[in-house]
C-alpha cells in the first residue's frame, strides 16, 4: 500500500508542476484556445482525482 501511495504522490507532484507551467502558457497563447481549454479541463480533473486518491491512500497508510 505504501508503494501505491508513493507513486500517487509522485504523480500528483508531476501533474502539479506541469499545470503550474502549462496553464500560464495556455492563457498566453490564444491561437489554439479550443485545444488548450480541453487540456486544461483534463489536467484539472486529473489533479483533483490525484488529490482525492492521495488523501484516501494517506488514510490507509498512516
UniProtKB/Swiss-Prot annotation:
Transmembrane stretches, start-end: 8-28, 41-61
Entry GO terms, CC: photosystem II reaction center; plasma membrane-derived thylakoid membrane
GO biological process, one term: photosystem II stabilization
Alphabetical list of HAMAP family matching this protein: PSII_PsbZ (MF_00644)
Family: Belongs to the PsbZ family.
Record note on quaternary structure: PSII is composed of 1 copy each of membrane proteins PsbA, PsbB, PsbC, PsbD, PsbE, PsbF, PsbH, PsbI, PsbJ, PsbK, PsbL, PsbM, PsbT, PsbX, PsbY, PsbZ, Psb30/Ycf12, peripheral proteins PsbO, CyanoQ (PsbQ), PsbU, PsbV and a large number of cofactors. It forms dimeric complexes.
Listed name of the protein: Photosystem II reaction center protein Z
Native source species: Nostoc sp. (strain PCC 7120 / SAG 25.82 / UTEX 2576)
Amino acid at each position: 500500500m505504501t508503494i501505491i501511495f508513493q507513486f500517487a504522490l509522485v504523480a500528483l507532484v508531476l501533474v502539479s508542476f506541469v499545470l503550474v507551467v502549462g496553464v500560464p502558457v495556455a492563457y498566453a497563447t490564444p491561437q489554439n484556445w479550443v485545444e488548450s481549454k480541453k487540456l486544461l479541463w483534463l489536467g484539472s480533473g486529473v489533479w483533483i482525482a490525484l488529490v482525492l486518491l492521495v488523501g484516501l491512500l494517506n488514510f490507509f497508510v498512516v
